[in-house]
Amino acid sequence: MQPFVHLHVHSQYSILDGQASIPALVDKAIANGMRGIAITDHGNMFGIKEFFNYVEKKNGDVNGLIKSLKKELDNGETAPERRAAIPAEIEEAKKKLFIPIFGCEMYVSLGAMTEHIDKKDTGRHLVVLAKNEKGYHNLVKLVSLAWTDGFYSHPRIDKEHLEKYHEGLIICSACLGGEIPRLIQAGEIEKAREVALWFKGIWGDDYYLELQRHKATVPRANHDVYPRQVEVNEVLMRFSKELGIKLVCTNDVHF
């Protein structure tokens, strides 16, 4: 089976939206044979510490093995033949580590995040993932600014600050609530193209157009979402070919 990692996931820290606890999400991903999972709660990173601690606990045995192998490698009494074999064993052990990916589904304002002009400007969704330590620090900075300077119904960030703190981040275009999907649904295809090119111009290969397909199977579910996703996906796949932007498939996990 093709490896898959969830990159768009809401925990119970997505207030009044997500239902799953972080341990339940991690345990389910591990049970399904996944190498990692991202937590991308709406507008906040409240669950990141719990996420990190729980994954560290789940990785305890593997980390213990890696530590033991490194100690053996550093031991001057280890036989040369054994020493030569240890690096490969360490790399093999690292493959068994479950990877926590820190992220946030941010709200991006249409104008400056400090402007409180349009009450409807609660922000367009954007999935932001930390690629490395620098990205983690930039993500924390952006989320903090969204709360302290950009809050207007929701904690919002703007493109000026996204560009300023872009280093080390991976960006995904998000769900139907993202700026590009919303423009596509409104028939503003050329505007959507311009926005995609803006993101690509800053993040390059670290910018992805996000495909989702959630077909409702129960009567009380929202059956309007799936056909809209199919419509948006067709345009996103066309953009991918025309603009050279990579695609990523996600599920908008809430429970």
Regions picked out by a protein language model, each given a short descriptive name:
Residues 1-255:
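Phosphodiester-processing cores and adjacent nucleic acid-binding clamps
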